[in-house]
């Protein structure tokens, strides 16, 4: 990928990687093709049920031949300009990995953790936090994230691993594969940053119901809410047969 910043330009070898299921979202696929094609990047995918294993196998294919990897989730929405902006920030900032802001599905939180601070201690940042274009974070996501291959090669394998909690369950207090990666990433001497002024979309499936009492004539709910709430629509839905 040819990166231009002001009067300077450099060729950066970028590998776009995806861990994917057999079926996916066409909106995302067309988004990816339109975002990567202008930069001459063809995505590499590995299909399987286990996110971490698939992504590690993708990384292993390119870690010795490319400068950076761009990890992409199959529900992320972004543009060619997003890719260009993130790579420019990565190269200029000196960080070893850089993620954009992305909101968690079915939640009101952005997916990153402040260094040394648990979500129980703090869940917001001040306005002046955004004045610095890249801020250090402890963990992030893989939705549209650049990682230097030199940083990956510092890490021992496995790069991804799910760890149960002290009770041997995954119902809280456990470590998911993506968080395991970022913790090992930092332990290997690497720095992860978040682009405070660059965001990507997160596609999520909603259920829309007709309504006679709500302005606009409809009410919506997340699919998870429907299944976890006794298969009931939200208040204001009209005509539902229980």
Protein language model features and the residues they cover:
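N-proximal low-complexity "stem/linker" segments adjacent to membrane-targeting elements
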Residues: 1-49, 53
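Short, high-confidence coil segments that cap the C-terminus of an alpha-helix
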Residues: 66-67, 93-95, 190
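Short beta-strand-to-loop acidic/aromatic patch adjacent to the donor-nucleotide binding site
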Residues: 66-77
């Amino acid at each position: 990928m040819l990166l231009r910043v002001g009067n300077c330009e450099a060729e950066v070898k970028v590998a776009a990687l995806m861990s994917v299921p057999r079926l996916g979202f066409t909106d995302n696929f067309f988004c990816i093709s339109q975002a990567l094609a202008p930069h001459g990047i063809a995505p590499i995918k590995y299909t399987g049920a286990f996110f971490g294993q698939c992504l590690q196998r993708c990384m292993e294919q390119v870690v010795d031949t490319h400068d950076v990897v761009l990890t992409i989730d199959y529900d992320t929405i972004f543009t060619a300009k997003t890719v260009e902006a993130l790579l420019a920030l990565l190269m200029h900032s000196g960080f070893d990995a850089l993620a954009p802001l992305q909101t968690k599905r079915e939640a009101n939180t952005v997916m990153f953790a402040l260094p040394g601070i648990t979500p129980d201690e703090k869940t917001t940042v001040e306005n002046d936090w955004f004045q610095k274009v890249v801020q250090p974070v402890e963990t992030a996501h893989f939705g549209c994230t650049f990682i230097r291959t030199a940083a990956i090669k510092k890490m021992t394998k496995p790069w991804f691993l799910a760890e149960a909690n002290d009770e041997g369950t995954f119902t809280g207090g456990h470590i998911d594969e993506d968080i395991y990666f970022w913790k090992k990433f930092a332990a290997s001497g690497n720095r992860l940053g978040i682009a405070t002024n660059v965001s990507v979309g997160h596609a999520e499936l909603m259920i829309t119901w007709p309504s006679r009492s709500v302005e606009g004539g409809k009410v919506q709910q997340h699919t998870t809410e429907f299944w976890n709430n006794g298969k009931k629509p939200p208040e204001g839905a009209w005509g539902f047969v229980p």
